[in-house]
Amino acid sequence: MRDMADRAQGRLLLYQITAPMLDLAIGMGLEIIKYGEEAVVDLSAFTLDTPRLRSVRKAERAVARKGAEFRIVPAAAVPVIMDELARVSDEWVRAKRHEEKGFSLGRFDRDYLRHFDIALVLIDGRIVAFANLWLTADRSEASVDLMRQVDAAPPGTMDFLFVHLLQWAQARGYRRFTLGIAPLSGIEGRRLAPAWAKAAALVFRHGERFYGFRGLRAYKEKYAPEWEPRYIAGPHGLGMLKALRDLSRLVGRPMVEASSPHLALPARPARGDGGADRPPTPPPAANNAAAAETAGVAA
C-alpha cells in the first residue's frame, strides 16, 4: 500500500481501522491516532423491554400512533420510488442548509441507491424517511448508509426507523447492527497525552455548538450499544496533518476532480442487492443523519 501511495505521489492514510489492524499499521511505520468509537448492537440480545431503551420505546410508539408504517423495498423496485426519495432528500438538504458531503459520508446518488434495498417510513402512504441498507452475505452484520427525512416528519421518526430496522435484521438472523461512528468519542486528553488527543478531547467536550459530537454519541447510546474503538493510521508529523487535510477535503468536496494528484476518489460500492458484501467498516453517513433530530449533525 505504501508503494502504491508513493507511485501515485500521495500520502497513505488508513481510515477507521479496527484494533486487529493496528499491528499491521505499526509494522508499516505509520502513526496511530484514535478517530472515535463505533456503536454496535448485539442483535442476539436486543430487546425493547429494558429500562435503557425506555426513551426509544416511547418515541417509536408515539410515531406509530400517527399512523407510521415501516417497509423494505427491494433493490429491483427502488427505481419506481426514486423520485420520491429525491424529494425527501432535497427537502432534508434544504432544511439543513448545507451541501452534500461525500467519500465516507453518504450522499444522494440515484445510480448508487438503485443497488440497495431501501427502508421506508410512510405516513398516509407518503414517504417521510428512508435509509439504504448495507447487509453482509453471511448475515454477520447489518447497517445503513444514507438516511434522510422530511422536515415535517414527527419527532422520533428516526427512532421508529431504527427500531424496526433492528427488529427486521434480528428476525432474519443478522448477528449485529452497526449504528456507525461517534467521532472523537472515547479520546482522553490527559496531561501526558499527545497534543492531538488533547485537542480532540477538547473539541468533543466543548465543540457541541459547531460539531454536535456529544449529541451524536448520546443519540446512539440510547440503543445500549457496545462501543468499539476506531483508528486512523498515517504518516508521522506534518505528513499526518496533510493527510487529514486531504481526508477533510474528500469528505467535504465529493465532486473534486479526479485529476487532482492527491485526491483520487474511489468509487462507492456498486453492489447491494440485499445480500451483497458491504465494505469492511461502514462510513459514518447514517451515523450523522440519525443524530440530526437531536444534534443537528449533517450527513
Give the ranges of each region predicted by the language model.
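Long, low-complexity, intrinsically disordered segments
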Residues: 283-299
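A conserved beta-strand-loop-helix scaffold within acyl/acetyltransferase catalytic domains
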Residues: 10, 15-32, 38, 44-58, ...
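Globin-like tetrapyrrole-binding proteins
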Residues: 7
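Residue-identity detector for glycine
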Residues: 272-275, 296
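A short acidic, glycine-rich active-site loop
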Residues: 201-210
